[in-house]
A protein has these predicted regions:
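N-terminal cysteine/histidine-rich coordination modules
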Residues: 1-38, 43
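Conserved Radical SAM active-site core
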Residues: 38-181
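Non-cysteine beta-strand/loop elements that form the S-adenosyl-L-methionine
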Residues: 183-187
Length: 187
């Protein structure tokens, strides 16, 4: 699962880089730059400033996911505010809200990480990597929580002469580090 691909970055390794932000982190650092990345699952984001509470499309869509059960309190309107109880919502209910909000005050963070699709996107910037001695940086969240994906992508990138870097706190099981060891050394 990933939540962003940032192209043309110059701050996360040598040269021009593309950063793949992966979801999932076992820490809860108060200074985290990407708190939306903590959950390895889809996350519901809400920007109250963009919300037109009168529209209530999110409330209606949520009610459909619970078959109109008024006791369920995942999303409800109280006075002129939308109240969200993320703990009361399943991942399927969160995904069902993906394109409901016309102002995008309510959005979903997280996309399924399909290796072939990600590789194709990451390779789009190959001319920039070649010119600047850049490459791809795996970040997050904690990228080593998805060691198979990171190892597979890094292997394919290396085969295409693209350097890789990993931003990690290393707070993962040692087997995850072992699985990614070759890419950590090869860079």
């Amino acid at each position: 699962m990933y939540f962003n691909i940032q192209r043309f970055s110059t701050h996360d390794g040598d040269g021009i880089r593309t950063i793949l932000f992966l979801k999932g982190c076992s820490l809860s650092c108060p200074w985290c730059q990407n708190p939306e990345s903590r959950s390895a699952k889809h996350s519901l984001l809400f920007d109250e400033r963009s919300c037109m509470a009168d529209c209530q499309l999110c409330v209606s869509a949520y009610k459909q996911t619970v078959n109109g059960d008024m006791a369920s309190d995942g999303i409800r309107r109280i006075d002129d505010q939308i109240i969200i109880n993320r703990k009361a919502m399943s991942e399927a209910q969160i995904i069902a809200l993906r394109n409901v909000c016309p102002t995008q005050a309510l959005s979903i963070c997280g996309e399924a990480a399909k290796s072939d699709d990600l590789f194709e996107v990451l390779m789009k910037d190959k001319p920039f990597y070649d010119q600047s001695q850049g490459g791809v940086t795996f970040s997050g969240g904690e990228p080593l929580m998805q060691p198979s994906l990171v190892a597979e992508l890094a292997e394919r990138l290396h085969q295409n002469h693209v350097s890789t870097a990993v931003e990690s706190c290393m707070h993962v099981p040692w087997k995850n580090v072992e699985k990614s060891r070759r890419i950590l050394i090869a860079g």
